[in-house]
Amino acid sequence: MELYFGEYQHVQQEYGVHLRLASGDTPKPRNSQPSKAGSYGVSIRVQGIDGHPYIVLNNTERCLAGTPFPENAPSFPSSVINNLSLHPSNGTVLKENTPEELQLPENPYLQTSPLRGQKQFSLHEGRNGVLERKDGPTKLPHVLNFQRHPELLQPYDPEKNEVNAKKHHPPESPWLRNATEDGTNCKKSRNCFPKSYGSQPNSPTSEDLAKTNMTAIRLCSSVVIEDPQKQTSVCVNVQRCAKEGVGEETLSPRRKSPTAPSPQAYSETKKNRPDVLPFRRQDSAGPILDGARSRRSSSSSTTPTSATSLYKFLLDDQECAIHADSVNRHENRRYIPFLPGTGRDIDTCSIPGVDQLIEKFDQKPGLQRRGRSGKRNRINPDDRKRSRSVDSAFPFGLQGNTEYLTEFSRNLGKSSEHLLRPSQVFPQRSVAQEHRGKHSPSSPPAKLQGAQGAHPKPPLQNKDGKVLNKGRQESTGACAPSLPAPNKKEEEIKIATATLMLQNRAVAATSDSGAKKISVKTFPSDSSTQATPDLLKGQQELTQQTNEETAKQILYNYLKEGGTDNEDATKRKVNLVFEKIQTLKSRAAGSAQGSNQAPNSPSEGNSLLDQKNKLILEVSELQQQLQLEMKNQQNIKEERERMREDLEELRVRHQSQVEETATLQRRLEESEGELRKSLEELFQVKMEREQHQTEIRDLQDQLSEMHDELDSTKRSEDREKGALIEELLQAKQDLQDLLIAKEEQEDLLRKRERELTALKGALKEEVSSHDQEMDKLKEQYDAELQALRESVEEATKNVEVLASRSNSSEQSQAEADLREKVLKEENEKLQGRIAELERRAAQLQRQMEDVKGDEAQAKETLRKCESEVQQLEEALVHARKEEKEATCARRALEKELEQARRELSQVSQEQKELLEKLRDEAEQKEQLRKLKNEMESERWHLDKTIEKLQKEMADIAEASRTSSLELQKQLGEYKEKNRRELAEMQTQLKEKCLEVEKARLAASKMQDELRLKEEELQDYQRAEEEALTKRQLLEQSLKDLEYELEAKSHLKDDRSRLIKQMEDKVSQLEIELEEERTNADLLSERITWSREQMEQMRSELLQEKAAKQDLECDKISLERQNKDLKSRIIHLEGSYRSSKEGLVVQMEARIAELEDRLENEERDRANLQLSNRRLERKVKELVMQVDDEHLSLTDQKDQLSLRLKAMKRQVEEAEEEIDRLESSKKKLQRELEEQMGVNEQLQGQLNSLKKGLRLKTLSSKVLDDSDDDDLSSDAGSLYEAPLSYAFPKDSTIASQI
């Protein structure tokens, strides 16, 4: 069988590995060498960075030159190769190698065949991306090359440079006929075919391919070649874990191939392989290498990077199964077999893009030498390392006996190994080979574990496009050896897993087809090498990496499904969690390393005791923390009780304040009622006062008039008396004179009679003029009487109106009626007197002479009457002026009333506004109460959640304690068991070789137990994952609580804003309160002034009452005097009618007029007083309303201020409660974080203990598996030959090394 890779170029810059595959169809270079028997088609160039020599391996020769393949073998035509699609991830295709580049010798087995007409069968690409075999008439079973030429498997002699074909003839195995057949498919990333092979001038024909038995293998995509008989597939998973994070490179699916896994599926299949081990070098004569150096050396020397090495890997396992000791090895190198899942099968280092590689080869075509890829960089002086000698592999000499091998396996991995000189190596190689050849037939055949399944199905995909390869992972985990997950160190680990599924077409009898997953175990018979701790550490680190990646993926999925964060945020969280885990594991790494390096030393007991003491201390610390948490819970409960008591006290205070406000409101209402009553009484007193004042004024006017009349009457009586006395004296004298003059008159009468006759005419004229004057006077008197009558009638009407309006005016009306009656009587009397006067006038006409003397008096009386009329007119004018002034005062009062009404409207509006404000404040208070209730409910929920979290944490802590104790017990038991078994095995190996089989049986039993315990550990890991999920849920709940607290802080800000608004409103209300206080002060000053005026009026009322009583007494006395005077006047009128009648009539007329005027003025005054009283009542009512409103406003403002203070206190208390809750929450979060850290530490310790257990259990297994294996001192590359190849090591290989 021959690999056909086209022209493949691959450069690994990071570790100096150059891989180049060349086939026979390429043109020969200019300076190419002729094809030799030792030429090759695959060249791996390893450039050591740490100072190691580079090694060139050739593993292309698969059969001897003289043994051609059968002619009827199947082949791949060029059309099939042209039909193969490119890898979609590589956008560019590798260019064809120019003659300058390809300086490698060609494959000698590629020969052109003349058989063109022969019928062939071809492989075509099916619908599902599967190569299908079509109509080939001949289906001949194939025999493998090494079966056809068994001398290829014989050991190689480096001295003679040839294969010892006669020493060993390996038997053929029927399994090999079924296992390795005519075609295999290898899947490998970063490889690509050229676009068109048919366009190449030197491409081989189908006959050539048929002749050379060459098989084309797709490396770009996952291809499954289907066979109706059997089928296998090749899957390569490459994974790399860097120090900074997890960098993944997924294989891209092939076009038109549903069976190829997607990138997400591939990433998941990568992560779920815990059985992968990296190959780490072991220093036999010194300490363990640091991370960087060992990483570089192991990656640069052990990991095969070519596609042929991949294919070789599968066939290596098969060959190891058939002939484990017949493989050609170098004597001075330690050998570790290529087991699947050991990390040495595939290189996982970073590979640059194809374009960069092409540019690099194009730039320096002439400098590509055979030995190294280019100019070596200068080594950092810190990284310089002394190269190891190849003589240190066998410290006890190269003897070919069992004693040497047992001693070597006993002291393998220890620092006390002896180093050999280079001169001791080559002379003894043949001896070692002979020894090996002698003992090789005695080794039993290798055990194969092949899991035959049904037809390989494509991997299922979920909604997110992730591949669910649970079945495959379980099968691989069951077949492959289960490896522990060790502590992760600060170094870069490269992991490669390969699951190779072969296809067999040769066997036609078997009808079932299935995927074969091969895991090979070699059980040598002679010696068993002991596994070193650093190798086991490398294995642990690799499985730890995969476990950590699976845990990371699980955490990422949980966080992504449960939370709403971005992918970056979730990745950061996962990385932070694993960084904490790494720090905890790095702390515990020292103790684990000590236990791994010296498993048989007594320091393990001390380390376990130290760990036990540490665990006891941690348990005590956790108990102390739990006690502190309980104390904190008790304190929180006490604070809650205190808060409840404070709330109850506040409620009681609130109720008491409400009751006090109710009592104060009742008192206010009572005081307002009393004030109203007192104001009504004051109003009545003022009304009575005004009435008394009016009555007093009337009486004063009447008294003044009476005094005037009395004065006038007194004066007139005195004058009349004096005049009468004088008249009497004169009458006496006249009588005397008359007696004297009688005589003289008689004398004169005679003379005068004469004169009388003369004068009669003159007297007649004078009497007529006098009569006319009297008529005029009569007419005037009649007119005045009529006016008086009309005024009397009007007065009666007004008196009736006044009587209907008020009872008080009835008395005055009765008095007026009496006065009217008196006046009527007096008028009647005056009329009688007028009649009498007329009679007297007739008499006066007779007595003209007597009247002449009286005329002068009458004229004087007339003048007096005129003067009185003028005075009355002036009094009328004065009364009109007073009326005008009263109207002006009335208008002013009306204006004041309007202003008072306006003020009342304003006050009512302000009252309405204040009521609205009060309602708003009440609503705000209710809102604050609701918020407070909500806060209390939220606090209650928070307390509940905190209690739940504490309970869960306590449960987790108890579970961790119990698990740690159980694991410690199990560790002790396992350690004792392992020590006993190791002692027994060593004694049995030294004494008898037959007891090895018993030990193997015991190891198999131990493996079963280990599997059971691993299942238990997996269950425990699942429980831990469930605990992690619970913890994540708790963290999510904590985040929700944080969001709720943030929302509450926003509500708090809103409350602060509302409080600020309320404070602004309160400031405004305070300003208004100050203004109203100033107004209230002004009103209080007005009230005091009004009260003073009231007191003054009361004193005046008392004085006026006293004066009224005095006046009434005077009135009574004056009425008596009037009666007396009237009687005297009547008496005097009777005596002096002639002189007195005119005056009395005039006086009566004047009195009537004055009375009429007084009555009119009294009416006007009464109306004005009524209007003034009404206005004053209104003003008083307004003042009372203003006072009441002012009092109510002051009370309301006081209540509002008290409420605001209470609300402020409540808000402050709520803020304090929120702060307390936040502080308690922070404390709980800190405690949770501390407990999480403690749990993580415990989990790390548990993991370390589990890993120690796994290492100890695997140590016995490694002893069984590594009997015949040689480990290279410098971690050099392994040289193995696949089943269908023979690799003779000639002089060219020695020169290249």
Curated annotation (Swiss-Prot):
Biased composition (Basic and acidic residues): 268-283, 379-389
Assembly notes: Homodimer or oligomer. Interacts with CD2AP and SH3BP1; probably part of a complex at cell junctions.
UniProt key word Coiled coil: yes
Region (Tail): 1259-1297
Pfam families found in the cross-reference section: Myosin_tail_1
Stretches the record annotates as Disordered: 161-208, 245-306, 364-396, 428-467, 586-608
Tissues in which the UniProt entry reports expression: Widely expressed. Highly expressed in the kidney and lung.
Phosphoserine PTM sites in chain numbering: 113, 203, 257, 284, 298-299, 389, 392, 482, 678, 704
Record-stated family: Belongs to the cingulin family.
Known function: May be involved in anchoring the apical junctional complex, especially tight junctions, to actin-based cytoskeletons.
Compartments, as annotated in UniProt: Cell junction, Tight junction
Domain notes: The head region is responsible for both junction and actin filament-based distribution.
Any GO BP: negative regulation of small GTPase mediated signal transduction
Keywords: Cell junction, Coiled coil, Phosphoprotein, Tight junction
Annotated spans, Head: 1-550
Compositional bias (Low complexity): 297-306
Name of the protein in its database record: Cingulin-like protein 1
Ranges in coiled-coil conformation: 604-1251
Sequence ranges of Polar residues compositional bias: 197-206, 592-608
Short motif (ZIM): ranges: 37-51
Primary location class: other
GO cellular component terms attached to this protein's record: actin cytoskeleton; apical junction complex; bicellular tight junction; myosin complex
